[in-house]
């Protein structure tokens, strides 16, 4: 393909990788100059009305690790990654004036803050959007987005029967060495972004770094070295350690690995090692992730409304004292407390824990579920807007749970932590 003598920006969003990266691949094929760009909005660094930042330190640290890796990987392709904090429009205009940018390639996002970001791109730059975060591409599902079923099982069965997963694409060929730009802003540090340095807690279930290389290292470890994928369905409700689940959500949240790549690795594993309920269940969870993305694509800003996608009215409270007790792990439920303290100390919590603390927050204390969702957004390293708000709506009874269940938390603790090992790990104070 003959390249146009033009300059394109690849605006990285939650797709921070070089392998199976549509925007990057398209830009490098069509333009003789390509610049990478990542923008950190100032809103991420500011406090919410509930006294925590929109992005707290654990997620910020993982993001910076991810950007460091991406910068190195792009440099191998002779592409510069320009990381900017603050005014996106001004940065793009500066790049346009200095390098004659004509085109911009990016992953399409449809939630409100991301729409507002996209509106800052100057009108005289041609934009190329792609749907690069799905397992099942929107063009390949057997229904219109407006007709996405409100029950997950219906969606899953239709997609499994009538759709397909596109094969992942490789890493693009390197650009000429003259494509590199040597005068670029330095990557910010945690301190420059306004955070204190954090240290890893020895009890963490996620002793991992951010970035594409770390994502593939985890695939190698969890799939091929230990073959823990073969037992995923049996262990996935665990609470302690790195082995009980894949933890791939960490890297998927930043797009350091694509769902298509994970799917392809599972299929390879099924051909060469074993195919069982556990290997299927990892794919099942990828479909859940897709489903919440489609639900938000269908319903738009309803996912941020107090009545959720159902428009249900409950008497929600905004009691700051109770919210703080929940955040501090100081509720009447030890199982909730242990999970909240793990989150505060590590930026992570198991899926089982998330469901229980969300159910307690919304169904026992009847607090505005959106405050809980905002706290998860701040704290969870693997925060994904669609899964986070989809799951919170589900647990609060305003989303996709047709039975509107609530968790019996003491029973959950007895079942999943029968010897109190998890609760002792996070609640027992050290004696000196």
Give residue spans per PLM region.
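Specificity-determining recognition surfaces
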Residues: 111, 115-250
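Short acidic/polar alpha-helix capping motifs at helix-coil junctions
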Residues: 55-60, 84, 210-213, 303-306
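C-terminal catalytic domain of photolyase/cryptochrome flavoproteins
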Residues: 2-4, 25, 199-206, 213-216, ...
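Trp/Phe/Arg-rich N-terminal binding region typifying the photolyase-homology
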Residues: 1-167, 341-342, 387-391
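Secondary-structure junction/capping motif
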Residues: 15, 56, 87, 111, ...
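Short loop/turn segments at secondary-structure transitions that flank enzyme active sites
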Residues: 40-43, 110, 133, 158, ...
């Amino acid at each position: 393909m003959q390249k146009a003598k033009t300059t394109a920006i690849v605006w990285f969003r939650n797709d921070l990788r070089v392998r199976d990266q549509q925007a990057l691949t398209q830009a490098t094929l069509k333009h003789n100059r390509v610049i990478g760009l990542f923008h950190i909005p100032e809103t991420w660094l500011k406090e919410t009305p509930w006294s925590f930042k929109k992005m707290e330190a654990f997620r910020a640290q993982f993001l910076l690790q991810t950007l460091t890796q991406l910068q190195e990987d792009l440099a191998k392709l002779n592409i510069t990654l320009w990381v900017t904090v603050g005014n996106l429009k001004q940065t793009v205009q500066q790049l346009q004036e200095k390098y004659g940018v004509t085109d911009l390639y990016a992953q399409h996002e449809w939630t409100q803050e991301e729409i507002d970001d996209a509106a800052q791109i100057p009108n005289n730059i041609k934009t190329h959007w792609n749907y690069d975060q799905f397992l099942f591409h929107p063009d390949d599902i057997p229904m219109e987005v407006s007709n996405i079923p409100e029950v997950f099982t219906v969606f899953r069965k239709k997609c499994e029967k009538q759709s397909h997963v596109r094969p992942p694409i490789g890493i693009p060929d390197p650009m000429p060495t003259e494509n590199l730009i040597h005068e670029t802003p330095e990557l910010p540090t945690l301190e420059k972004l306004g955070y204190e340095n954090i240290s890893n807690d020895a009890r963490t279930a996620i002793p991992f770094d951010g970035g594409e290389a770390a994502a593939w290292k985890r695939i190698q470890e969890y799939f091929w070295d230990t073959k823990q994928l073969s037992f995923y369905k049996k262990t996935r409700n665990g609470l302690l350690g790195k082995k009980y689940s894949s933890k791939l959500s960490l890297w998927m949240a930043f797009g350091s690995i694509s769902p298509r790549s994970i799917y392809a690795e599972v299929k390879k594993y099924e051909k060469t090692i074993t195919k069982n309920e556990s290997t299927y269940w990892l794919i099942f969870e990828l479909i859940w992730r897709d489903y919440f993305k489609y639900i938000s694509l269908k319903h738009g800003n309803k996912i941020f409304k107090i009545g959720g996608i159902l428009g249900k009215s409950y008497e929600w409270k905004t009691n700051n004292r109770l919210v703080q007790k929940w955040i501090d792990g100081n509720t009447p439920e030890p199982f909730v407390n242990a999970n909240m303290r793990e989150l505060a100390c590590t930026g992570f919590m198991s899926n089982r824990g998330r469901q229980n603390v969300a159910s307690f927050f919304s169904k026992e204390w009847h607090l505005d579920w959106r405050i809980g969702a905002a706290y998860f957004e701040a704290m969870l390293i693997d925060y994904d807007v669609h899964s986070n708000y989809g799951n919170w709506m589900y647990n609060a009874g305003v989303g996709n749970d047709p039975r509107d269940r609530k968790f019996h938390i003491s029973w959950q603790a007895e079942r999943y932590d029968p010897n109190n090992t998890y609760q002792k790990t996070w609640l027992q104070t050290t004696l000196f």
